[in-house]
Amino acid sequence: MGRTQPSYTMAVNRELEKLERIIERLHSPILSLLLERVKEKVRYTQSASYDELVDPYNLVYFALIWALAEECEKMEEYVLDAYPIKGGVKLFLSNFKEKTIRTTFPVYTITDNPDIVLQHPEVRYYEKEKWKTLDGKEVKVYRFEVESLDAYYYMRKRLNVVNETPTVLSQTLYRLGIKPFRRFRSSDDEFPKVTIARVVPLDWYGESLKGKVFEVKINNEVRRFYEKPEVEVDIAECLGEACNYVKSNVKIRIEKKRSPVSAKGLIEWSFISLTPIHEIAYATIGKVLTINEAWVAFKRRIIIPKVVPRVEKLRRLEDIMMVDKGGLILFPQPGCYDNVYQVDFSSMYPSLIVKHNISAETVEACDDIKTELHSICLKEKGIIPEALQWLIERKSELKKIDEERAEAIKWILVASFGYLGYRNSLFGKIEAYEMVTYLARKTLRRTMEIAEEMGLRVLHGIIDSLVVKGDNVDKFIEKVEKETGLRLDYKRYNWIIFTITRNNTPYPTRYIANMNGEMIAKGLIRENMPNIVKSFLEDVLREFSSAKTCSDVKKLRIRDLFEHYRKRAINGEPIDYVIWIKDVPYVRGIKGFYEARLGYMGRDVNYYINYLKRVYEDVEEVMSRC
């Protein structure tokens, strides 16, 4: 071919330099990353082509096409998780693929001497920016770009570092356009098509850290393995030794979780909070809520401090008694009622926060809305209302397609009200909390008045829900929605039973209802009951499901069912005697309670028979009121 190896290499390098100049003019981080891939391909192709040298121009652009094809393939994968490394982030993608992105990390600091920070070897440069505090005061903030999180940890010990929520890693991914559980560099809003598994060992008492049997649920298919399973999925939640038999880019240990949501729920949290899943897998609900609120502040360039010092102002005792009342509860008249409706405000507390613009920085800031309690400012939308509004809308949409993900959003919305009054909340304030309970009581009282005005009988009311009896419920709901500006849902029950305590007082949080054969039982079956008692009550509810009216309930006979379970208490399986208390299994033995994990060592038959008898008598008492 008339070319020597050195001259050929020089020709290839010239073509690479041309391509590099073109990419530099475009100022694209993605193309710059692509150029590095092209150089790798060129080196590989050169090393394999010494015997038959390819034209330098063709070689470079062949490498470009090759790199583009690989990048496009990776863009089809979902970003499952991300970890910081020196000089960049490492992405873990679906189908066990990985990708490294070269970048720096932003660290926001309030300092009078930014130049001295540059002496740290991993601090590249800084930019001066204008931010403001929650009360609107403008502050000078320096954004340092660092090569690794080690530099960030060094700085936060010595400087006033702010904007640490969302995390530095989350901020880095956000500005790179990389969002968890989306396709690489994509903003699509569809739930990722990934494989999700739950793998747990089973012992005689149920789920265990160790066991000879393994229950494996992959997406919606459940199987049991009587030997060590081999599981390969994108995301797995696993318990104890089961984690040793799972291959996954995201592995969540169930025993470390601090939230009530499943792996699918954690994916939803990661998805909405733009936070890598490993940062929230073991977090509380409050942390996820705070991250979502912090993103609103961050995008508005409002400084997010480590701690917000808030001191409650001095008040008279009578003032505190007036505001500190909590939610409104109407005690029901015990008994059974046919043809009733349960009317619920959908996400009542979060909806009131959004409607009335309740946030730490809006309460007592100006007098746009005056109440007997506090005033609210409407000049700018509050951080908390903005953070909650789209979550309310998302929950409503998800309920139509995926109850599990909707439940994950529901937990955040439930926590949103309590965190308003939490002393360590970044965006909370006790006065804001008081405003919400005040408006909730006012709203429920007015709803009860409307019901009575329209001839409905109010049987029960608790915080955000009413049980009413009568006609024209549709018109009642329409009027309440129009007057309050809040959305209502309702269910029609064939019958409902309100119960009493053993002290003969109404039990507002416990009732049993039949909705066309589907049983709704609140406060009846408790988590800390023995398994045999839970099974008894579940069978009682199955009997109740056949009753179409209160009269039918009264005709039911459950004595035979009780006798069956009394005999089972004497001759039952060991698992019947297990009692779960705070995720620990116990059994009541002759000498007292012992941990089931130590092995089965007998049971106190009288304890279980007496427990069943008490519950049976409670059920009979309930039926006698029909």
Curated annotation (Swiss-Prot):
PANTHER family: DNA POLYMERASE CATALYTIC SUBUNIT, DNA POLYMERASE DELTA CATALYTIC SUBUNIT. Belongs to the DNA polymerase type-B family. It holds the Pfam family DNA_pol_B. This polymerase is devoid of exonuclease activity. One of its GO terms (molecular function) is DNA binding. CDD domains: POLBc_B2. This is DNA polymerase 2. It comes from Saccharolobus solfataricus (strain ATCC 35092 / DSM 1617 / JCM 11322 / P2) (Sulfolobus solfataricus). One of its GO terms (biological process) is DNA-templated DNA replication. It comes from the Archaea. Its EC number is 2.7.7.7. Keywords: DNA replication, DNA-binding, DNA-directed DNA polymerase, Nucleotidyltransferase, Transferase. It catalyses: DNA(n) + a 2'-deoxyribonucleoside 5'-triphosphate = DNA(n+1) + diphosphate. Disulfide bonds: none annotated.
